[in-house]
Amino acid sequence: MYTKTDGELLQLQGLSCYLPEEGMVFNNVTQEFESRGIFRRSSLDDKQFWERPQPPGDYLKKRQKEFTLQKSDPNHVDLELQNYRVQEWDRRMNGFWFMNNGKPTYLTGLHYFYLTHWMLDTGYPDFRIPDLEFFYFLQYCIEDPHSLGMIECTKRRQGKTVRAGVFLYDLTSRAKNIYGGIQSKTLEDAKNNVFAKGLILPFKQLPDFFVPVYDTEKGQTPKSELRFFKQNKRGKNQEIYDPRTELESTITFKSSDMYAYDGTKLHRYVADECGKTKDIDVFERHQVVQFCLQLDGEIIGKCLYTTTVEEMDSGGEDFQRLWEASNQDERNANGRTKSGLYRYFLPAFKTLYYDKYGYPNEEKAKQYYMNERESLEDDSKALASYIRKNPFTIEEAFWKEGETCLFDSIKINKQLESITWMREKDLFHRGDFVWKDGKRDGMVEFKQSRKGKFYIHKAIPVDLEWNDVDKKGTKFTPTNVSKFVAGCDPFDHNVVASGSRMSNGAGYVYAKYDANSDLSETFICEYIHRPQTSDIFYEDMLKMSVFFGCKILVENNKIGIVKYFQFRGYEKFLMKLPKSKTF
């Protein structure tokens, strides 16, 4: 998926996924592309669809006979069963092609394993195009050396937990010394929903050739961890020789605590329902977990975050920070997103109706959801809740439900949606004020910088030469006072007493009333920063005032900035309150 091939290129939510050429798979053992052909259920296109491959007839009976004969002859194999085992391991490791309504369709090895052998409480999974795309996206993340994994958000009951289970199991059950970890919104959820239902339930239905030797000391059904170790033997049993190889790999679950896996090497990690986790900041927890997936700066493990989003006061706000930090379209010089993750959203209208080929009927689903929305139009709180639980867009997934809101939650959500998801560069200019050509007391210009201390309203044309200032000798007077005014809360001390908090200096510029301006009575410039010395702050405020050509009102108990302006010849930039004789 990650490496370019001669096969089809699919664009999936910002990732360029490369499929093998039709009928070809990449053999993970030989590290070469090899032909496997394309399975056809029928020669007729309309009768070509996914049908779970069946094991040989009387499989269990034949396997029991083979097992019995192997007790006296360890080299005995049933050729039919052996061919089936080799076939299924090949497909699990390398993938599978089949014809679907006349279209050659490629399944990743993990997706094939999920469809064919990962039995749920309702039976084996159906083939669905959204799942196909999910496993493509996941495989890309697994192969990408710059990715820590993926973060998935969609509506309820879409199989997120069981897909997380097969993701955990796959590598851990076929490689040595692999460690997998699980966290959910509570310890009980990690144990009962992910470990027991998403992992152990399907695990117990697997054919024996996909089940490594595991520790059954506490019973055939693991309750606290899945250990691919030989059972500890005691007493006379210590003398019994067991020739089977143990992988010495483990899958555990832990509480939602931020440091539960701190210091642990993780090769696979699942954070289930991370948008519902209360009392724990999942964004900050990820800062701990990500280092469990790395060794000396190299990524050695992959994670899968899954959730449906709940109210912001129930963990959603922290999840939104993690989501925003996982934008695959925004990467640093090392090729990574801020979180190391890539994000994946599945809209509700792709989850409701499917044809026999696995394609969602999006128009029918949209109409269904829109009918439901229209029926709730007279109850804005109920409508907001319904939209959030069945979102068409990621913005809707983060809508506030409005249970405790006194106002129209639909209008509030639409307004929040319009501003919350705007990027920084769409809202303001960020940078610093500097003296043009380094000439002090000359022209001030604005230099844009991602690390700048000043934020200026996007509508302000910062590339123009503002500087409405009158200079007479060494004295300066602002001449744009009818349009703008500034204010600041300074600090005078470079060092504070031990244990005291160092407050930031603050400065703002305000556009006065102007009937012809869209910026009338609007704050247009912000500065909240504490430079190393107070003089640097004073100079920043001076340059800001010069750029806009306006007066500045300073807190009158901080005399340092007043003296600085007076010493520099900018006393007339200082504003006096009405009836006040001092600045």
Region spans (language model):
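Pre-P-loop entry segment of helicase/translocase ATPase cores
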Residues: M1-G149
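RNase H-like, metal-dependent nuclease domains and their acidic two-metal-ion catalytic environment used
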Residues: Y2-C17, G23-M24, Q31, S35-I38, ...
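Walker A/P-loop
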Residues: P145-L168
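Residue-level preference for the first positions of well-ordered beta-strands
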Residues: G149-I151, Y179-G181, R268, K551
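Post-Walker A helix-loop "phosphate-sensing" segment adjacent to the P-loop in P-loop NTPases
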Residues: L171-I178
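Conserved nucleotide-state-sensing and coupling region of NTP-binding domains
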Residues: Y179-D257, I419-M422
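Metal-dependent DNA phosphodiester-chemistry modules and their immediately adjacent helices/loops
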Residues: L206, N332-P360, F565-F583
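Signature of the SF2 helicase/ATPase Hel1-core->accessory helical subdomain module
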Residues: R268-Y353
